[in-house]
């Protein structure tokens, strides 16, 4: 939304990438096939893509970094345990030494790469991507210019609606780094993409069916995603935490005009 379409003015939480499930030769969506797809994808990403990333960085002269294939997660008691082998998305962290004396906990010195094998293939389009340095200074960082196949904002708008609706079906919804989705929706709402998203029932239903088939979250009632019943309003029990998170977002992530939380 920021680099490809210039709709939002904030830093990204991560780099979201997708590998088509057809790449692994799996098309079916039953439970056993989903688990097989996730396991194959995780192994490929951590064993092959991670090594390719390391080799490519070394080839262009980058040094001083470390690559971490994330294989553990911290539970509610603070204990670390192995991530399930069929967990999606798969995460790679690229840690780098910051040139700043003081770092911010909200923005750790790392690049977080999330790669999913469950995403829809369409609709997407090719977009020109430039770095912030390249956009700000003529002739600088031109080597970073590239064409990337990117999800169209119409689909992103709907996926964020469903993501929030699903999150708020949890008994204890998350809040840290989650308010960015509300900011994105607010910025998208009045664009042509937001208008189209709310009028394209075919795409709306296709995304719901895809999420139901490929994610099949046990705590989600996908029937509630119908336009007449979808609810992405922040529950009263966590609204304070979401407001605190948005305060951090405005301070550390949003570099353009920030919207008011209660607007």
Language model regions located:
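Structured mid-to-C-terminal alpha-helical surface segments
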Residues: 5-10, 21-263
């Amino acid at each position: 939304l920021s680099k490809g379409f210039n709709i939002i003015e904030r830093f990204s939480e991560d780099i979201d990438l997708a590998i088509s499930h057809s790449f692994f030769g799996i098309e079916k969506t039953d439970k056993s096939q989903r688990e097989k797809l996730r396991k194959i994808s995780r192994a490929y990403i951590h064993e092959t893509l991670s090594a390719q990333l390391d080799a490519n960085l070394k080839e262009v002269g980058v040094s001083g970094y470390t690559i971490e294939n994330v294989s553990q997660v911290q539970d509610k008691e603070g204990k670390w345990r192995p991530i399930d082998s069929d967990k999606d998305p798969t995460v790679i962290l690229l840690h780098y030494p910051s040139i700043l004396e003081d770092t911010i906990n909200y923005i750790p010195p790392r690049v977080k790469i999330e790669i999913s094998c469950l995403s829809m293939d369409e609709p997407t389009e090719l977009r020109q991507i430039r770095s912030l340095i390249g956009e700000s200074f003529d002739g600088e960082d031109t080597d970073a210019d590239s064409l990337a196949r990117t999800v169209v904002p119409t689909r992103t708008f709907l996926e964020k609606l469903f993501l929030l609706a699903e999150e708020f079906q949890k008994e204890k919804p998350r809040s840290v780094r989650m308010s960015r989705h509300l900011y994105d929706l607010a910025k998208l709402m009045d664009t042509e993409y937001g208008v189209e998203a709310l009028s394209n029932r075919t795409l709306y239903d296709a995304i719901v069916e895809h999420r139901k088939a490929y994610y099949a979250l046990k705590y989600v009632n996908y029937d509630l995603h119908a336009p007449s019943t979808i609810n992405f309003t922040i529950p009263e029990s966590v609204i304070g935490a979401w407001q605190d998170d948005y305060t951090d977002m405005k301070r550390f992530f949003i570099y353009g005009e920030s919207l008011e939380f209660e607007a």
